[in-house]
Amino acid sequence: MSTFVQKPAEVEKKWVIIDAEGLVVGRLATVIATYLRGKHKVTYTPHVDDGDNVIVINAEKVVLTGKKYTDKTYYWHTGYPGGIKERTARQIIEGRFPERVLEKAVERMIPRGPLGRRQMKNLRVYAGSAHPHEAQQPVALDVAKLNSKNVRSA
């Protein structure tokens, strides 16, 4: 018996929707990264984009554990001398684009390369509960029920 190898033409992508309200960022990001890469399928092939399309709503209501909300710092560089910039997770979540905290967490769990960039395009993150993907009939995935530690109890 030979090893199964998925061909790009045989890939069947589904649409999955996840409500991120009250979920821990890192634990949610691992589930999303698994679905984007297709590792939850028995047909997983490392060099083929056979992951699903993932829609995340309520990204502004994600939770960070410990003191990460105030202490976690995101850095980037403008490209100019002395152009290092930084923002805390709190500043980003309370700012204009709160979904970027979750996007960065997932992006850093996906391999960096052409395949990883293609897989990241299958992720759609929305700060609120509205999304324009009703026509795709996404299947709801309840991440909170997968493990009790996925939800942060107050």
Swiss-Prot record:
GO BP annotations listed: negative regulation of translation; translation
GO CC entries: cytosolic large ribosomal subunit
CDD domains: Ribosomal_L13
InterPro entries: Ribosomal_uL13, Ribosomal_uL13_bac-type, Ribosomal_uL13_sf
UniProt keyword terms in alphabetical order: Ribonucleoprotein, Ribosomal protein
GO molecular function: mRNA binding; structural constituent of ribosome
PANTHER family (UniProt xref): LARGE RIBOSOMAL SUBUNIT PROTEIN UL13M, RIBOSOMAL PROTEIN L13
Family to which the UniProt record says this protein belongs: Belongs to the universal ribosomal protein uL13 family.
Function: This protein is one of the early assembly proteins of the 50S ribosomal subunit, although it is not seen to bind rRNA by itself. It is important during the early stages of 50S assembly.
Complex and partners: Part of the 50S ribosomal subunit.
The protein's name in its UniProt record: Large ribosomal subunit protein uL13
Organism listed in the record: Allorhizobium ampelinum (strain ATCC BAA-846 / DSM 112012 / S4) (Agrobacterium vitis (strain S4))
Gene name linked to the record: rplM
